[in-house]
C-alpha cells in the first residue's frame, strides 16, 4: 500500500465485472431501467457510490446539448471505461467530472460530496491526454510536490511522498530535471508520480495513451492495473480500455446507449459498429 494506493500485481487481466446490480450488458432502452435499479441498490447499500451522476446535461452557449440527461454511478474500486466516436461527448463529460465546466442541469457527486466547478478535491486525481498540460513547475520534484503541498501536509511529509512516488515510478534520477526537457513517456511517469503522491480515491484518465510509445503505454497499463481505487478512463484506444477496465459505457449523441461488462459489450460487433466503433482486434 502507498498512502491509500493498494498495489496487487494480479489486477491486470482481472475480469471480475461490475454492472450495477446485474451481470448482463445493458443496451438501448434498458439503460434507463438499469439507472433506476442502480439508484435503488445505492439506497440499500451502506457504502455510497464513488461517483454518482444524476440527470446531467450540458450545452455550449445554449446550443444543442452535448450531454443529455445522463444518469449512472460507479462503485468504489470499480474500473469504468467510457468509449464513443469523436464528438460523442466524452471529453465534455470528463471536463465536468474534473470541475472545469459547470453542468447546464443535473448533479455530480464524488465520494458523497456535491462537485462544485473549480473546487480542488485532493481525493480526485486527473491524468490528461497530454502530460505537458499538468507539468508546469521548474523541476520534476516541484511538479510531484504540488498536490501534497496543497493538501496541507508538512514539508517532511511532502518530501517523503515525493521520494516514494519517484521510486515507485522509476524516475528518481529525474527529480532535478526540467519537465520540458523530458520525453513523452517520462512526462507521463512524472504525472503518474504526482498522482501517487496525492493518493487519490478516484482517478480520471482522459486519453492517457495518446502521446505514449509502446514501452510507456505498457508501463501505464502496469500502474493502472495495480490501482485498486476507483478508475475512470476515456479513450479511443479500445485494447487499452479492454485490458484495464472491467465495465464500459458507450456514449452516442450525448446519451448512454450501452453499459455492461467490458468484454461482453466490446465483443458485440453489431452494437459497436452501430455506434461508430470497431470491435477490438483481440476479440475478433
Curated annotation (Swiss-Prot):
SUPFAM superfamilies: P-loop containing nucleoside triphosphate hydrolases. ATP binds at residues 84-91. Its main location: membrane. One of its GO terms (molecular function) is ATP binding. Coiled coil: none annotated. One of its GO terms (cellular component) is ATP-binding cassette (ABC) transporter complex. It comes from the Bacteria. It is found in: Cell inner membrane. Its EC number is 7.-.-.-. It is a peripheral membrane protein. Probably part of an ABC transporter complex. Responsible for energy coupling to the transport system. This is Putative ABC transporter ATP-binding protein sll0385. It comes from Synechocystis sp. (strain ATCC 27184 / PCC 6803 / Kazusa).
